[in-house]
Structure formats: C-alpha cells, structure tokens
UniProtKB/Swiss-Prot annotation:
A Pfam short name: YidD
Family: Belongs to the UPF0161 family.
Identification of the protein by name: Putative membrane protein insertion efficiency factor
Domain of life: Bacteria
Keyword DNA repair: no
UniProt membrane topology term: Peripheral membrane protein
GO CC annotation terms, alphabetical: plasma membrane
Subcellular location(s) per record: Cell membrane
PANTHER family documented for this protein: MEMBRANE PROTEIN INSERTION EFFICIENCY FACTOR-RELATED (PTHR33383:SF1)
Length: 115
C-alpha cells in the first residue's frame, strides 16, 4: 500500500487512537468525578455513556459530533428520555431474532435468561 491509500489508513488509525484516548478520559470522569456529584442526567443512556458509544461506533469525527449534539440537548429546554446513538444504515436487528436471544439456555456456568 502506497500513496493516498496508505496515508488514509494512517489517518484512520490515528483517529482511532485519539477516540480511544477520549473514551479513556470519559471513563475517568465517570468513575472519579461523576460519583461525587448527584445524578442529574435526564437521558438514557447517560450523556457520558452516549459519548463512549458514539466514539466507539462511529470514530473520532462523527462520534465527537454526535456527543457534542447530545450535550447541546442537555438542559431544561429538552424533556430527555430514551436517546440512543443512531443505527448505522443496513444494521437493523430482526426483532424476532432479538427476542429469541433472551431465551437461550445458559451453559458452562453462565447466567440464565433475564426474562
């Protein structure tokens, strides 16, 4: 691999590294600072979990944009509630298959179904 293809891969790799660094900083906040403050997030998942999920799923640029947009919604002017990261196009889950996944029998010492 040479030329533009190689530099594109290097940029994506650097973006992943920076995204992982941001996730680490968010996790530090979640485990060190957040427990010292009262729970005030009006969203599920919380804004910090949303940011981790967005960075993990979409990478540095789009994940940061999604996290910033979510933080901009955080305030008394928004009702909050369920607000997951958007699905990637073409990654829809079949609801029948998803409900069947909860009914799988536990094996080798794993926990059983929650439902």
């Amino acid at each position: 691999m040479t030329g533009p293809a190689r530099s594109g891969a290097a940029i994506r790799g650097a973006g992943r590294t920076v995204a992982r660094g941001l996730i680490f900083l968010i996790q530090l906040y979640r485990h060190m600072v957040s427990p010292l403050r009262p729970a005030t997030c009006r969203f599920v998942p919380t804004c910090s979990q949303y940011a981790v999920d967005a960075l993990d799923e979409y990478g540095l640029i789009r994940g940061s944009w999604l996290a910033a947009a979510r933080l901009a919604k955080c305030g008394p002017w928004h009702q909050g509630g369920w607000d997951p990261i958007p699905e990637r196009p073409g990654c829809r889950v079949n609801c029948q298959d998803a409900s069947d996944a909860w009914a799988v029998r536990a094996t080798r010492g794993e926990s059983g179904s929650l439902v």
